[in-house]
Amino acid sequence: MRSIVRTSGVLALGAVLMLSACSSGSTAKASNVNAREVKAKVAAVDPASVPMAKSSGCGAGAAGIAKGQTKETMTSGGDARWYFRQVPPAHDGTTPVPLVLDLHGYSEGAQIHLLMSGLSTFGDAKGFVTLTPQGTGPVARWDTTLGSKDLKFLGDLLDTAESQLCIDTNRVFVTGLSNGAFMTSAVACQFNDRIAAAAPVAGVRTIKGCTFKRSVPLVAFHGTGDQYVTFDGGLGQKALDLPAPDGSGKKLGDTLTPAQRTARSGDSIPTIMAAWAKRNGCAATLPTEDAIATDVTKVTYPCPKGAETILYRVTSGGHSWPGSTFSQSIVNIVGPTTMNVNADEIMWAFFMQHPLIPATK
């Protein structure tokens, strides 16, 4: 990994909002979110009682995999793709370890995202493998459409990791920022039978056409002052100044119609969270709210055990990763970052409470 990382223009951490806020193809309204769904399965099981499940890679070959961070390449759908892989000291090739898929934001790219989330370093301490893949396009992004080549790549990436490393397939998780949070939502849908839990940061979404075979526990984070993916729904002003996805040098706002530029299209974060709760079989009553810091409220939806759905709402928070010192250092780009909670710590504790229950696969 290069030792110097440029942050100018970093970027457009939230812009793929354009793909969901400016068209009806990537989000679904809460009112019809269950229209084509089967009833989600929920299992109330003590997480400590869920055994580790060895991936096909467990054995002598996995034991020889180098620890630490490497940049890996692979082919998916005929395309050359790459990703960063962080193998923790705890990986011995025979004892399965958890895996976290960590997805970058629009124009952010995998290298910057390593700094933003800090999950690779955090994973070394906690004992999980971290995969940080690169998206596609002149302006790196993810196509969140179900069945897209990007989703195929991520499925192939999980297959590759599980065949090369000793992974606990009951403890495979996904997180991401902004467009990476959009993709986190899509991954949780398309790979519903292998993703144990999800943690979108600054961009939870409902995905059009998604049907759940099982409930997917979800913990989300979003700032009320986000100027990219706005809390109330739609494009923020800063999103309009982001680079267009075609690499033409134009701004995103230049590629939109006047109506699109002024529209507050797209569901609000509370509406999206309510839709996730509904998918997860939660009761149709108001969530409870608990102030856990001066600027952070934990919003807990009334869900059955094993289908928990939680939002950490950051008052005046920006398009940022809570607890990230890197995020805090680029306040001029992403807005305020709360340091009163740490998203890595919260999502990891949530993940460990929500392994994939074999009976619900």
Model-derived segments and their meaning:
Residues 310-311, 315-353:
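Extracellular low-complexity, Gly/Ser/Thr-rich intrinsically disordered linkers
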Residues 70, 74-173, 190, 232, ...:
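Serine-hydrolase catalytic machinery in alpha/beta-hydrolase-like enzymes
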Residues 142-146, 255-266, 330-339:
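Active-site rim elements
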Residues 91, 105-109, 135-140, 178-182, ...:
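Solvent-exposed loop/turn segments at secondary-structure junctions
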Residues 115, 119, 163, 170-218, ...:
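Primarily recognizes the serine-hydrolase "nucleophile elbow" in alpha/beta-hydrolase
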Residues 196-294, 300-306, 316:
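The feature captures the conserved acid-bearing segment of alpha/beta-hydrolase catalytic domains
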Residues 22-97, 175-199, 205, 271, ...:
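A domain-start/cap signature at the N-terminus of enzymes
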Residues 1-26:
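Secretory targeting and sorting signals
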